Amino acid sequence: MGMSVTISVATEQDAEQIFRLQYLCFQSEAALYGNYRIDPLVQTLDSVRQEVASDCVFVARLGEEVVGSVRGKVTEDGAAAIGKLCVHPRLQGHGIGARLLRAAEAALAEERGAKRFRLLTGHRSEGNLRLYRRSGYETVGRSRGADGVELIILEKQAGAYAATA
């Protein structure tokens, strides 16, 4: 019998595994846009450590290995910015990303008072867009990242997370 994937709050000890996983997972996004300077690939380990310490960060574990991660924080306007959702390439397509997203939504709404959730993804990232739309997110606009990538902005009301959980 194989091990099952568990979702839990990230700890300080997870930061290095999150950092490495993020670098691996976002290679395909970088290739999609021909841009290897996207934020997840240039973020420092110290910056990941700071996010784990201050933001709402969840990991998916298979045994002791971190195989997925997501981060979120409530912004000044009461929205929760959710980002850097990633799942190890060998485990994608098994619902781990959706589970991580639901865990972040629940914590951000219940523990940090988020009224709505917001996330951004590149305009060519069809797999990401499918996941987010299946999870109840709707496109509310577009912007351009500091790295030059055209981004789609998606949102949903915090009350809606329970319906997709």
Indicate residue ranges for each PLM-predicted region.
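A short beta-loop-alpha structural element at the N-terminal edge
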Residues: 6-20
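A short helix-loop-beta-strand connector motif used in the catalytic cores of GNAT acetyltransferases and
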Residues: 47-59
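Conserved active-site alpha-helix within GNAT-family acetyltransferase domains
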Residues: 98, 123-141
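Conserved GNAT acetyl-CoA-binding A-motif
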Residues: 108-121
